[in-house]
């Protein structure tokens, strides 16, 4: 699954991850995992940054943004 271009993310995004439904999110702090995706646990900001096909391998998509 292609991920959003790093250069197009808001500067504050430090983590990138995709949920099972295919939605890509940018997070200010490392998100926590739940059964179908990721959440920010009320700490930091998050922003929707893209949509792709549902991904059964979503749990492997969490990446730190350089």
Features from the language model and the residues they span:
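Low-complexity intrinsically disordered segments
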Residues: 41-66
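Amphipathic alpha-helical oligomerization segments
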Residues: 4-24
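Short, surface-exposed terminal/edge motifs of secreted or surface/virion proteins that either
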Residues: 22-37
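Assembly/interface hotspot detector across virion components, adhesins/toxins, and nucleic-acid enzymes
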Residues: 14-18, 36-40, 46
């Amino acid at each position: 699954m292609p991920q959003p271009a790093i250069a197009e993310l808001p500067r504050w995004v430090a983590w990138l991850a995709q949920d099972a439904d295919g939605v890509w999110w940018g997070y200010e702090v490392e998100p926590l995992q739940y059964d179908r995706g990721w959440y920010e646990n009320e700490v930091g900001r998050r922003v929707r940054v893209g949509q792709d096909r549902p991904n059964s391998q979503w749990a492997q998509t969490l990446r730190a943004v350089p």
